[in-house]
C-alpha cells in the first residue's frame, strides 16, 4: 500500500474525503469538548416521587405535580401543572432518573434546566422551583448527599423563564445514574387561581463526542 508522510503541520483550505479508516482511531478524549450540551427529559418518563412504579397523574393531586396538556394532540404539548394554589399553600413533586451518557466528561459540568413560571396568575405570596439530585450507588442506595448546589429560585411570573440548577460533577462518571426530583412550592393568600407550570426540563452536560 502506498504511503505518504508529511512532516510538520498541514493546512487544507477545502474538504478532506477519506475513503478508508482513520488509523489509529481518534479517542474520545481527543475530541473538542462541547460544554453544556442539552439532553431532554421527557415528561412521560417522570414518576410519582414516593411511588416510582406510578406515572404522574393527569391532574395534580396531594403532593404530586400533574402531567397536563396531553389530550389535545396537535394543539397542546405536554407540560407539568400544579394544583390550584389560590388562597392556600401547595408543595408538589416530580421525579426522574437520568443515566449520564458515554460522551459525558467525567467530573465536568452537569446542570438541570427547567423552563417554568405561573400558569394563569401570579401568586400574591411566593412561587419557587427547586431540584435535588442523588448519585445512585448501583446497589439500591445513594452515594453521598444532594449534589445540587443551587437554591430554589423565584418563578412567580407569567413570563416563563429558564431556571438552572448546578449539579456538583466531582464524583460523576459516564454511565452513572442520577436520581432527580423537582419541587414546586406556591404560597398564596387571596388570589382565585394560581398554578405553577413547567414546559420543559433538560439536563446540560459537558461532553466529548
Residue ranges of each PLM-predicted region?
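Intrinsic low-complexity, repeat-rich intrinsically disordered segments enriched
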Residues: 1-64, 68
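Short carbohydrate-recognition loop motifs
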Residues: 68-88
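Short beta-strands within extracellular/lumenal beta-sheet-rich domains
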Residues: 84-109
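A short beta-strand element within beta-rich, extracytoplasmic domains
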Residues: 107-119, 199
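Beta-strand acidic-aromatic groove motif in beta-rich domains, primarily in extracellular
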Residues: 108-111, 122-133
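Extracellular carbohydrate recognition and processing domains
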Residues: 138-172
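Short beta-strand-plus-loop segments that form exposed binding edges in beta-rich domains
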Residues: 181-190
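C-terminal interaction-tip segments
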Residues: 190-209
